Amino acid sequence: MSKKLHIKTWGCQMNEYDSSKMADLLGEYQGYTLTEEASEADILLLNTCSIREKAQEKVFHQLGRWKTLKDKNPNLIIGVGGCVASQEGKAIKDRAQCVDIIFGPQTLHRLPEMIEQVRRGDKAVIDISFPEIEKFDRLPEPRAEGPTAFVSIMEGCSKYCSFCVVPYTRGEEVSRPSDDIILEIAQLAEQGVREVNLLGQNVNAYRGATHDGAICTFAELLRFVAAIDGIDRIRFTTSHPIEFTQDIIDVYEDTPELVSFLHLPVQSGSDRILTAMKRGHMAIEYKSIIRRLRKAREGIQISSDFIIGFPGETKEDFADTMKLIEDIGFDHSFSFIYSARPGTPAADLPDNVDMEEKKQRLAILQDRITQQAMRYSRHMMGTVQRILVEGPSVKNPMELRGRTENNRVVNFEGQPKHIGTFVDVEIVDVYTNSLRGVFIRGEDEMDLRRSLRPAEILAKRKQDDELGVTQFKP
């Protein structure tokens, strides 16, 4: 009988990526296969997120449900990973005796050894250290699961925004060597991947070592990835405005593989609140980035993150945020009511914004951005859009589903042979969460390939006297 593994994942795309690597790791080295049913599993892993409110309580509620399974099967192994594990450590075991393993985002590669320790009789195995880049050296070779793939290029964050736990739970910024990233993406391309999404808490801070001892910037990495045969689309998430430098903007001007869509968190449009958040920039500097981006890539669409009701946020501060939303014309957002994260500087600030007021502000903000997104979608009516076909439509398996450059799902009638390829469709209808298209042409009628020598990429390296992001030019 095959051994079964069940993984429950909460949180960001980095967590989704980590969970997929856990499955690959335990599948390759210990023969486990994934199951959707926790009751069937020999190992239960909970990959946690500490961003949202009451994250710890959510973990213990889930562990309470899993305890009933362990009561029936004492050999069941339960592990808790992710950011809550890093934050709470041994306190998880103290409160939930059913837990056998506690591991952080940087130690998931040690899971096989930790499982063996439990089997040998250790009552609790805890490893929430930050061994820098060792994690990636121990993971199995990448395995494609469709035409799109996520690739982690760095870990951690060194910005220490006053509201954020990431530097404390994932450590400071550590970049993977550029050669390792390029090799991983090339291997994925050989397996049919056409679009990669480069992941990190702050990808534009990427500074990866090269084989010759130099440092590869994020802008250079983007160009190297674009030159990999078979990779026709590149996305990345997430970025920080203070390191969105001109050399990155220049890539949008000359690298068509980089999509015309950017997620760039701003959190607030109020300079006073941005200062309290320790974001390191003002609203005008954010607008300067977007202005230069739109000069480099006409029609690029922008999404962002917003925190509503940060301690001390006044009606005037919120009005500044709404003004920024109108000025930029955001296409999408992840927006949340502020909740204090234990151990962060903002947790000590008096939370003097009424909850009902926070809810009203959130509803107003989300309604405005939804209206703007629908306006963009309606402008796409009658246009021809190139989409990467990801598979059957979710609601109608007789149809196909693809995604535009600006991250919209398009459903259309097409042949199964188009899955994993690019097609052009005409947009004929607009819905709240998707578009409808009519097939126009397949990939065999397109010219998608281009080549670029490494020397040409390095020739674009920014000069020492290049102006940084904090310089505003009207």
UniProtKB/Swiss-Prot annotation:
Cofactor: [4Fe-4S] cluster
Superkingdom to which the source organism belongs: Bacteria
Enzyme class: transferase
Keyword Iron tagged: yes
One annotated GO molecular function: 4 iron, 4 sulfur cluster binding
Domain (TRAM): residue spans on this chain: 378-441
InterPro entries: Elp3/MiaA/NifB-like_rSAM (IPR006638), Methylthiotransferase (IPR005839), Methylthiotransferase_CS (IPR020612), Methylthiotransferase_N (IPR013848), Methylthiotransferase_N_sf (IPR038135), MiaB_methiolase (IPR006463), rSAM (IPR007197), rSAM_horseshoe (IPR023404)
UniProt keyword annotations, A-Z: 4Fe-4S, Cytoplasm, Iron, Iron-sulfur, Metal-binding, S-adenosyl-L-methionine, Transferase, tRNA processing
UniProt domain Radical SAM core: residue ranges: 143-375
Disulfide bonds: none
Record-annotated MTTase N-terminal domain positions: 3-120
CC annotations in GO: cytosol
TM spans (from-to): none
SMART domains, per the entry: Elp3
Family: Belongs to the methylthiotransferase family. MiaB subfamily.
Protein name as catalogued: tRNA-2-methylthio-N(6)-dimethylallyladenosine synthase
